[in-house]
Amino acid sequence: MKSLQIICLLFIFVARGSCRSCEICHNVGNDCGYDYVEECHSPEDQCGKVFLEISSAPLSIRSIHRNCFSSSLCKLEHFDVNTGQETYLRGRIHCCDEEKCEGRPFPGLPLSHPNGYVCPGVLGLFSEDSSESEAACKGDETKCINIVGYRKERFPGDIAYNIKGCVSSCPELRLSNRTHEERRNDLIKVECRDAVKITPSE
């Protein structure tokens, strides 16, 4: 069941998309098994390629997405969220002006140790409210991120998600404009704050 949730979660972050045509594909793994070209709709005005990875020791699953993206999403470029319990959600975004964008592969996870900061940690799917645990921040992770939203699909319907964890910096994410496109990824909460420093007990 956990593996199924991880695979589903990989697909909900990529919203569909100015008169531009881009290559479209969604696949688990590092390569697209199929693709087709589709005209984009405003505000998704750039072609892009996204690698997503959820690693939850010892399981690691990657997916690839080529699609139409908004310029605001393209500016994000990459993200790494430590949701606790040795689980990471990672993404690499590359946009271009051509139908088929080629991005750089994932770097390996850095070897880092807890730095004394903590954040609430959640990697939840199918619900905006999920039980949270404490995420021990590592390396240069000193910020806490909280993202809640849903992916609207014709089938199986709206997929809610809730993500909390440690990040090294606050991403430039904005709440979605719900006035466009029938199939979309809607952010309904984006919060980022300083992590809490744990004082060692004497």
Curated annotation (Swiss-Prot):
GO cellular component terms, A-Z: extracellular region
Tissue expression as described in the entry: Expressed by the liver.
Cellular compartment(s): Secreted
InterPro entries linked: CNF-like_PLA2_Inhibitor, LY6_UPA_recep-like, PLipase_A2-inh_b-type, PLipase_A2_inh_N, Snake_toxin-like_sf
Signal peptide, first to last residue: 1-19
Protein's UniProt keywords contain Secreted: yes
Keywords, ordered alphabetically: Disulfide bond, Phospholipase A2 inhibitor, Secreted, Signal
GO molecular function, one term: phospholipase A2 inhibitor activity
Main location: secreted
Keyword Disulfide bond set for record: yes
Pfam family, one: UPAR_LY6
Domain of life: Eukaryota
Other comments on record: Concentration of this protein in the serum is 8-fold lower than in the E.quadrivirgata (another non-venomous snake) serum. This difference may reflect the difference in the food habits of these snakes. E.quadrivirgata preys upon snakes including the venomous snakes, whereas E.climacophora only preys upon small mammals and birds.
Cited PANTHER family: LY6/PLAUR DOMAIN-CONTAINING PROTEIN 8, LY6_PLAUR DOMAIN CONTAINING 9
Role summary: Inhibits the enzymatic activity of the phospholipase A2 (PLA2).
Subunit structure: Heteromer composed of subunit A and subunit B.
Family note: Belongs to the CNF-like-inhibitor family.
Protein's name according to its UniProt entry: Phospholipase A2 inhibitor gamma subunit A
Lineage, top ranks: Eukaryota, Metazoa, Chordata, Craniata, Vertebrata
